């Protein structure tokens, strides 16, 4: 048996303004070429835009959006006997949240327009209202899992 102590789990840092780990996760996914200050600036502009448009706390809108986009199940490709099956698997909450953030930012990037701050603010507001591309992606994933429920025993 090893005598060394186990390493302490690294906790995610929270952002300077909202002191929220979810915001920090979003910034880290938004990050390009190591330009974190730019990512923070984009996200804070988006939050300001949300506050102006909805007159609500932007953090609660963000939480609501992530909650609405977070999937419970996903499909994984599993090769059995020469054919590939889409096998539905349950997702742990942390992985679901990471997927939701990825989908939200992907949908924001695909929106028409110039400013990423504007595009992401509109996508977050849409997701909080339960519509938008990211929510459609989640529903599509759930439909795929439902359609391939017969292959669940291949896990």
Curated annotation (Swiss-Prot):
Cite the GO molecular-function annotations of the record.
rRNA binding; structural constituent of ribosome
Sorted keywords for this record are: Chloroplast, Plastid, Ribonucleoprotein, Ribosomal protein, RNA-binding, rRNA-binding
- Disulfide connectivity for this sequence is none
**Family annotation (Pfam families):** Ribosomal_S7
GO BP annotation list: translation
Gene3D superfamilies xrefs: Ribosomal protein S7 domain
> What is the annotated localization of this protein?
Plastid, Chloroplast
Offer a single GO CC term for the protein. Answer: chloroplast
Described by its record, this protein's role is as follows: One of the primary rRNA binding proteins, it binds directly to 16S rRNA where it nucleates assembly of the head domain of the 30S subunit.
Q: How does it assemble?
A: Part of the 30S ribosomal subunit.
The UniProt family comment states: Belongs to the universal ribosomal protein uS7 family.
By what name is this protein known? Answer: Small ribosomal subunit protein uS7cz/uS7cy
């Amino acid at each position: 048996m090893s005598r060394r102590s186990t390493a302490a789990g690294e906790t995610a840092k929270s952002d300077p303004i909202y002191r929220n780990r979810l915001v920090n996760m979003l910034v880290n996914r938004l990050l390009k070429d190591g330009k974190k200050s730019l990512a923070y600036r984009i996200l804070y502009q988006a939050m300001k835009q949300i506050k102006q448009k909805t007159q609500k706390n932007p953090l609660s809108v963000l939480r609501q959006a992530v909650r609405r986009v977070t999937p419970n199940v996903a499909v994984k490709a599993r090769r059995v006997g020469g054919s590939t099956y889409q096998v539905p698997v349950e997702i742990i909450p942390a992985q679901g949240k990471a997927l939701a953030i990825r989908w939200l930012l992907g949908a924001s990037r695909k929106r028409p327009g110039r400013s990423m701050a504007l595009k992401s603010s509109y996508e977050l507001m849409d997701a909080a209202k339960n519509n938008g591309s990211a929510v459609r992606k989640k529903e599509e994933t759930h439909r795929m899992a439902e359609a391939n429920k017969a292959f669940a025993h291949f896990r």
